[in-house]
Amino acid sequence: MTNPSEGTTPLAFRYTPELANKIEGEWQNYWTDNGTFNAPNPVGDLAPADGKALPEDKLFVQDMFPYPSGAGLHVGHPLGYIATDVFARYNRMLGKNVLHTLGYDAFGLPAEQYAIQTGTHPRTTTMANIENMKRQLGALGLGHDSRRAVATTDPEFYKWTQWIFLQIFNSWFDAEQQKARPISELIPLLESGELKTKDGADYNALGDVEKQKAVDDYRLVYRSNSTVNWCPGLGTVLANEEVTADGRSERGNFPVFRKNLSQWMMRITAYSDRLIDDLELLDWTEKVKSMQRNWIGRSRGAEVDFSAEGETVTVFTTRPDTLFGATYMVLAPEHELVDVLLEKAGSYEGVDARWTNGQASPAEAVAAYRASIAAKSDLERQENKEKTGVFLGVYATNPVNGDQITVFIADYVLTGYGTGAIMAVPAHDERDYEFATVLGLPIKEVVAGGNIEEAAFTESGEAVNSANDNGLDINGLAKDEAIAKTIEWLEEKELGRGTIQYKLRDWLFARQRYWGEPFPIVYDENGQAHALPDSMLPVELPEVEDYKPVSFDPEDADSEPSPPLAKAREWVEVELDLGDGKKKYTRDTNVMPQWAGSSWYQLRYVDPSNDEQFCNIENERYWTGPRPETHGPNDPGGVDLYVGGVEHAVLHLLYARFWHKVLFDLGHVSSKEPYRRLYNQGYIQAFAYTDSRGVYVPADDVEEKDGKFFYQGEEVNQEYGKMGKSLKNAVAPDDICNNFGADTLRVYEMAMGPLDTSRPWATKDVVGAQRFLQRLWRLVVDENTGEVLTRDEVLTDDDNKQLHRTIAGVRDDYTNLRVNTVVAKLIEYVNYLTKTYPDTIPAGAVLPLIVMVSPIAPHIAEELWKKLGHDDTVTYEPFPTFEEKWLTDDEIELPVQVNGKVRGRITVAADASQEQVIEAALADEKVQEQISGKNLIKQIVVPGRMVNLVVK
């Protein structure tokens, strides 16, 4: 083992920023040179060379990895990274084998946009940003196993992203078994007739191309002509999650239009029930669980068939008991039957003008209406604002009473939820009521209890006006019974069926970009998709000069995507042998979305250099497999602690769970879930400043005068906001490390408040953390001579009480990620020692302190540990334990109240009886002064807390 101070000049004796920087650099080199934080695997190239068995007790702690775009980190970014490092270091001291590393999520739109702005290739920009971020993170002293670090842009990594894509592509979801199965197991079921094709055709009677299509209809990855979010300004399609509520791109703020395109989709909806139900297995916050449940949006109800001009229009409703109140129908403007029904539509002659949107015919009205909503996002369409729509010129038949009801299209109905059509019950639905009121449509009460003249009645009540002559009468029934009876009648008459619907939609899995994982898919001359064999992976991005996306006029809704990879003709047009001789193929020119690499990266951390597998299952089982003996019988397995922001609750986390479940179904992993425990850290906030236009100005250039703030002479407004580039209030960690030291930054960020809450940054307060470390240093090192100030001496009882209570509290706080209170307890203990031992100090009092400090301030702890005669790192020193006998007081002090006011204090034995406590209170001189000559009415003892005497 190398020693970081061997061969160096004597250190300065005072703990200054200069000394801190020197110590920190030396110990960081020591950790790197000695592989201090390297965690061994059971098998493979990271297994112990001597064959030594691994500890059964392990910990896999993981951060949500960063996006290496822009100008690097600000002090808000390391908050979670420092916290996980503290937790990992503490657990190493408990004897656990700890896996902690950090990679880079380097593909995707942010990196590409930044590269476009700077005029350099995304790879060049990304690698430079990664190196800068590595430097910044390295300066913080994070205890990462650098051998396990990955970047999603490394071909060695995305080879396996492509491989996992192919596993999903070559799978189908067996609804009966509720799991993914290989496509090879599907074909025999289609051939035998045990499973039907999606369109009901006889599989064996189909030609080869039709058979392939029948199989493709079952795949978990498929191409679909679907309505997507097309952003001409970015030149790509966006997922719903990447579109803001006002219908603009989250990145770049460009208009987004709804457009029908053929796109790769992942059938995440097949896993809706498991994604909801398995949340109960996870140690996640209820907030995140609720967000995922709401995003998936499971609703129980019925599908009901309405007849319209010879066509069947199926609606989904959670309230089939209100069918008698359905007075009109609404289809989403994109519904596939709209154009079919338009061909059968009548004229607008005699039609209410409010229904026509000022147009002469249904066809013209529909075209104009569709154009008017093209730029609206789903969220914008569902906002509570004035309802709009147009009459389709046809009528539908209400199946329960035979009423002819008008059929409209309106933007508040979406194709992605339910069936894209609704039965409108305005008396008992607020949106339907608003629509009916605006357009003058009938409103019929079918649930008693409200006043439909004033508003929709949406609460529960008995059914009224709800009977027909065909065997259905639910009048007088409560909601649940009425629903059940209506569904039973619908199924008996073959007019509907009970069912479950979800808000969740299949995952749009393609982008028209350059900087992403290429698809391992080629197309033959007939346009049929073929998966590439494993031997042809990775499909690497071609080197191209023109990597910029083909962007369009941001307002050009009629533009068509043109992926930049399509320009690389030599790469696109290939001749391959896929098992039946060489043939010409065309590569897919889309790339995967930014979420692909982050959907599985924790598994590559486990086995980062395995060339044969994405992750050896023996290594996966050790690090993430279920441990029912530790975590309970229903433990799903997964990473032991995953720390990151709550903003990823329904994006990354949902996608990662989906991919992991497919891998579990196919037998590639032993864990059912990717992340056993999730912890959402808060944010570091800082003052931000806006000028009279509301534009943010650089916080560093703002001056304060007489309580007001000025930028270039103009008064500006001060506000708090999340630290970042957009608010121009970022503080670089480099500056804090240079001016105070990394340990000071670590202590300050951990002491600012509970980890799961946001906290304000104030550079002027950092000095408080520095002073704490200086006091710690002075306990051990004489600032004048550099001599060590410890001596061999038995601790006093008071010393032992302070030490063991500190150990007990700190252990509990570290275990529960209450690092801010760890710092508070350590400060209290240092203050006690400083006051008690102004000259020299017993080694037995300070050695445990250094170990307790080391997870938070590892560099100074290592240096002091070495000064006290140790040759090895403090990293694996067993964490101090406490003795119970020092946690309880022999004597306690109790306040004594007389008629509710404290009049004295007494000291009694901790186990004193109530009678002994009263006797001591009455004997106290100050208390006697208050009760002398008065009658003692009542005496109350609150054990361990206080004594109250009532006199008169």
Curated annotation (Swiss-Prot):
Gene3D superfamilies, alphabetized: HUPs, Isoleucyl-tRNA Synthetase, Domain 1
Motif range ('HIGH' region): 66-77
Binding site for ATP: K725
EC number(s) stated in the UniProt entry for this protein: 6.1.1.4
Transmembrane residue ranges: none
Pfam families listed in its UniProt record: Anticodon_1, tRNA-synt_1_2, tRNA-synt_1g
GO cellular component assignments: cytosol
Disulfide bond sites: none
Record keywords: Aminoacyl-tRNA synthetase, ATP-binding, Cytoplasm, Ligase, Nucleotide-binding, Protein biosynthesis
EC main group: ligase
A molecular function (GO) term: aminoacyl-tRNA deacylase activity
Origin: domain of life: Bacteria
Compartments (UniProt record): Cytoplasm
Recorded family membership: Belongs to the class-I aminoacyl-tRNA synthetase family.
Entries under NCBIfam families matching the protein: leuS_bact (TIGR00396)
Name listed for the protein in its UniProt record: Leucine--tRNA ligase
Organism, as annotated: Corynebacterium glutamicum (strain ATCC 13032 / DSM 20300 / JCM 1318 / BCRC 11384 / CCUG 27702 / LMG 3730 / NBRC 12168 / NCIMB 10025 / NRRL B-2784 / 534)
